[in-house]
């Protein structure tokens, strides 16, 4: 396995699960959004405000291309990374892809107090999350080697299921 890549919506647990997986596998953990923030010296909401979503997505595409060239990392992506064909191709080629699926209710609960989510600056975040998932779910599934449900499950149990499911896959 070159890399282990986590995709899924906001609030699915990609960063939390990714850190635990990296520790378990003794691999470095990278979060594409955090890497963008480190490189630019600006947080994601500021980038959205100054460059708009298209500007952020350009930065994200470059970061994903770079991170997928690595060897032996656990990578958590932003929820919208799958929207670009180039990202989906890079993620698929970059390693094993795990789709962490979470219900809208779980996503709302996990993101409610997070001010770093520009797309959720709205009166009705559940509606926005529902609309985003309707568009993105087929794209997550398109590139996923494994789909894992995260609702009402402790992160450690999710990690154990991911490792077990990946062990069952034939080499590629």
Curated annotation (Swiss-Prot):
The lineage of its organism: Bacteria, Pseudomonadati, Pseudomonadota, Gammaproteobacteria, Pseudomonadales. One of its GO terms (cellular component) is cytosol. It holds the Pfam family SKI. Substrate binds at residues 33, 57, 79, 136. Binds 1 Mg(2+) ion per subunit. This is Shikimate kinase. It comes from Pseudomonas syringae pv. tomato (strain ATCC BAA-871 / DC3000). CDD domains: SK (cd00464). Its EC number is 2.7.1.71. HAMAP family: Shikimate_kinase. It catalyses: shikimate + ATP = 3-phosphoshikimate + ADP + H(+). Its main location: cytoplasm. InterPro entries: P-loop_NTPase, Shikimate/glucono_kinase, Shikimate_kinase/TSH1, Shikimate_kinase_CS. Pathway: Metabolic intermediate biosynthesis; chorismate biosynthesis; chorismate from D-erythrose 4-phosphate and phosphoenolpyruvate: step 5/7. The gene is aroK. Its cofactor is Mg(2+).
């Amino acid at each position: 396995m070159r890399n282990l890549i986590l995709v899924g919506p906001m609030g699915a647990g990609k960063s939390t699960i990714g850190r635990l997986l990296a520790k378990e596998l003794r691999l470095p953990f990278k979060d594409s959004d955090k890497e963008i923030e480190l490189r630019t010296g600006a947080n994601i909401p500021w980038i959205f405000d100054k460059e708009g979503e298209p500007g952020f997505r350009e930065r994200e595409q470059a970061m994903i291309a770079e991170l997928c060239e690595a060897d032996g990392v656990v990578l958590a992506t932003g929820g919208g990374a799958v929207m670009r064909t180039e990202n989906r191709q890079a993620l698929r080629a970059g390693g094993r892809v795990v789709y962490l699926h979470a219900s809208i209710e779980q996503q709302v609960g996990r993101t409610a107090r997070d001010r770093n989510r520009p797309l959720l600056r709205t009166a009705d975040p559940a509606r926005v999350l529902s609309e985003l998932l309707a568009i993105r779910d087929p794209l997550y599934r398109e590139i996923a080697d494994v789909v894992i449900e995260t609702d009402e499950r402790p992160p450690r149990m999710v990690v154990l299921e991911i490792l077990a499911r990946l062990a069952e896959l034939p080499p590629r």
